[in-house]
Amino acid sequence: MVIMGNKLQLENKILKGTTTVGIKVNDGVVLAADRRASAGFFVANKMVRKVLYITDKIGITTAGSVADLQFIYDVLKNIYHYNNITKYGPISIKGIATRLANVLSATKYFPYIVQILIGGYDDQPRLFNLDYLGDITEENYVATGSGSPVAMGVLEDEYNPKMTLDEAADLAKRAVFSAIKRDSFTGTGVIVAKIHSKGHEELEFYLNKKV
């Protein structure tokens, strides 16, 4: 059973070491994340990928334990492909998020140390935030990780549901860079994914070229 002390330790592990951002607008969804991986106060890796894809139109951002995140990423891909090869057919983004929430809820007493954003475009833009207990919320904009308080301040101040996908991508980039400047566990650069009805485009930005 998870006691309060352990729960706080788990939450600290999830919050420690990254900043990810998701933004939903009329044209699609933007997912963004920094590239630093930390082990305590040590920079373990400067070029980690935290924006991943289930399909060309569905992506995720990851925060938490690397091993748990790798497993959960495989689970998400299996959920999608299983539906495709059975009579059920293509699964919606909401369906994928709900299935993952069920998995996380079922293991909450021995939890996977993860926080996941799932975003993409099926018949419309969708963006979901899931924590390690299986809590799931649909969001217009959201930030996770140790730098999320800084990033969320930028999003709160500048988000507009009528902004274009390019404007949302620029906002996501600036939100993560703001966290890089103030959060020691967030760093190197930013990957920004623009997901729309025709697929996705990915951009990379760095404070300087030397990494």
From Swiss-Prot:
GO CC annotations, alphabetized: cytoplasm; proteasome core complex, beta-subunit complex
Enzyme class, UniProt record, top EC level: hydrolase
An MF annotation (GO) of this entry: threonine-type endopeptidase activity
Principal location listed in the UniProt entry: cytoplasm
Gene3D superfamilies from the UniProt entry: Glutamine Phosphoribosylpyrophosphate, subunit 1, domain 1
Reported regulation of activity: The formation of the proteasomal ATPase PAN-20S proteasome complex, via the docking of the C-termini of PAN into the intersubunit pockets in the alpha-rings, triggers opening of the gate for substrate entry. Interconversion between the open-gate and close-gate conformations leads to a dynamic regulation of the 20S proteasome proteolysis activity.
Active site: 18 (nucleophile)
Catalytic activity: Cleavage of peptide bonds with very broad specificity
InterPro entries: Ntn_hydrolases_N (IPR029055), Pept_T1A_Psome_bsu_arc (IPR019983), Pept_T1A_subB (IPR000243), Proteasome_bsu_CS (IPR016050), Proteasome_sua/b (IPR001353), Proteasome_suB-type (IPR023333)
Propeptide: 1-17
GO process annotations (BP): proteasomal protein catabolic process
CDD domains cross-referenced by the UniProt entry: proteasome_beta_archeal
Function: Component of the proteasome core, a large protease complex with broad specificity involved in protein degradation.
Family: Belongs to the peptidase T1B family.
Listed name of the protein: Proteasome subunit beta 2
Organism encoding this protein: Saccharolobus islandicus (strain Y.N.15.51 / Yellowstone #2)
Gene: psmB2
